[in-house]
A protein has these predicted regions:
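Primarily recognizes Gram-negative and organellar outer-membrane beta-barrels
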Residues: 1-445
Length: 445
């Protein structure tokens, strides 16, 4: 629901606009995926494989917008230019060959998939329209693994894949939920090709220590990016939709130039004092995201660091606990000159305990603290406390009936930041208030 009120004064004349909108979105998706592989040894330590992959995805979206004019008593009216009934079918066939061979401490894998894909879109309302795209892609892959010894190894992996545009990205209906930031889809979008390269080093010791270091890079050709323009005067879009001066319209387009770099360090070791394991990690991600703003291509750079510590313990088969803390340090900077840098930190601390006591009774409790720094005063820190009480029964305690209570303190919130071509959007949403659920669980062993 959107309630909109506007008053403009121009040349001594005041014009008032007032209306309410209700949007009904009904979306359905069906998918099917299968994979067949045959492997045949050809010589010692060398194997040849052949595979066939099939996937099918059907998506339907019925998006209707109803509007009532606050200045009249006409009731709700269906707005055709803001409504759409759209269906997409994405079908892929891929045949591939692969070669695998082992040589002392080395293991090599090399392969390629030859993929044919079709994307069909059909709009049946408000006007009939169809699109059809066919694609042929060669998607190579490779892996090299070198083992220094049984507990010490390197692995280099390369993969490529394709991604089809979503139904929401293809629907050309205009969304004016926020009249200052209009958005629409683009039925002419093409598929996106992804290339991923990862290097991993793993070390484990007899004393239970583990060290993992990872480096990664991702390149996306035909990345589905935002193209945004700002109206320099009041204009009317196709379909009769009004766009005020200073408002902006964003639509998706395919752009090359997206890349991201990832790194992660993890160190784990046992802590005998409380019969637990400690895991320390640091992850980092840098992404350069292409956009178009007022016809000029630019890049938004996003940098994220996530330090994390986890202490997990299995004191016995009846009692365990986990303590953890992580901080997500976020920085975003656009190449658009007038856009300021966005910096904020999200802190998450969590304590979890599970206890099975007298006569198969179980008690579980999780308390999570989420805090923010660098954001507006409207974003509040909060605690989320969930707990459950259950009873195990039947042979080997295979069954359990349980009462779960969620958000006992009633403080849960939802927050998300999105980075646009020339803006940062901080989104908060209402979440389900405290509730309880009774469940029955049966474990098959």
């Amino acid at each position: 629901y959107t309630d909109y009120k506007e008053s403009k004064t121009e040349d001594g004349t005041t014009t008032a606009t007032e209306y309410s909108q209700r949007k009904d979105n009904d979306e359905k998706q069906t998918s099917l995926r299968t994979n067949l592989m045959y492997t045949e040894p050809i010589v010692d330590n060398v194997q040849l494989s052949a595979n066939y992959k099939f996937s099918y995805s059907n998506s339907d979206a019925d998006k209707k917008t109803f509007e009532s004019d606050g200045m009249t008593d006409l009731g709700e009216q269906l707005i055709d230019q803001m409504s759409s009934v759209y269906q997409t079918d994405y079908l892929t066939h891929a045949a591939g060959l692969g070669l695998r061979w082992n040589l002392d401490r080395w293991r090599f894998t090399l392969g390629a998939d030859f993929q044919w894909a079709s994307l069909d879109g059909e709009q049946s309302y408000p006007v009939a329209d169809n699109i059809s795209h066919n694609y042929f892609s060669v998607l190579p892959s490779a892996m090299i693994r070198y083992s220094l010894d049984r507990n010490n190894s390197f692995m280099l992996r390369y993969r490529s894949s394709s991604t089809s545009p979503t139904l929401q990205q293809l629907q050309s209906v205009v969304d004016n939920t926020n009249p200052l930031f209009l958005s629409t889809g683009n039925p002419l979008l093409d598929q996106q090709i992804n290339h991923t390269l990862n290097l991993r080093y793993t070390l484990t010791t007899m004393s239970g220590q583990t060290f993992i270091a990872m480096l990664g890079a991702t390149l996306r050709n035909g990345y589905v990016a935002d193209s945004t323009f700002v109206a320099t005067e009041d204009i009317t879009l196709p379909g009769g939709i009004e766009m005020d001066k200073g408002a902006q319209l964003t639509r998706p387009v395919n752009l090359d130039g997206y890349y991201s770099l990832q790194a992660m360090l993890t160190y784990g070791f046992p802590l005998d004092l409380i019969r637990s394991n400690v895991n320390l990690s640091l992850a980092g991600n840098y992404a350069s995201v292409p956009t178009i703003f007022n016809g000029v291509k630019s890049n938004t750079r996003e940098l994220t660091f996530v330090p994390k510590v986890v202490i997990g313990s299995n004191i016995s088969d009846k009692l365990d606990f986990t303590l953890s803390y992580s901080a997500s340090i976020n920085k975003a900077l656009s190449s658009v000159a007038d856009l300021n840098t966005s910096n904020y930190v999200t802190h998450i601390a969590q304590a979890r305990v599970g206890w099975t006591f007298w006569a198969g009774l179980t008690l579980r409790s999780t308390l999570t603290y989420t805090g923010y720094s660098g954001l507006s005063a409207d974003t509040e820190d909060y605690f989320l406390w969930n707990a459950s009480l259950g009873k195990k029964f039947l042979k080997n305690n295979a069954a359990e009936i349980r009462l779960d209570v969620y958000d006992i303190l009633g403080q849960s919130q939802s927050f998300r930041q999105s980075v646009g071509s020339n803006y940062y959007d901080y989104l908060t949403a209402n979440v389900l208030q405290p509730y309880a659920m009774v469940s029955f669980v049966y474990t098959i062993r």
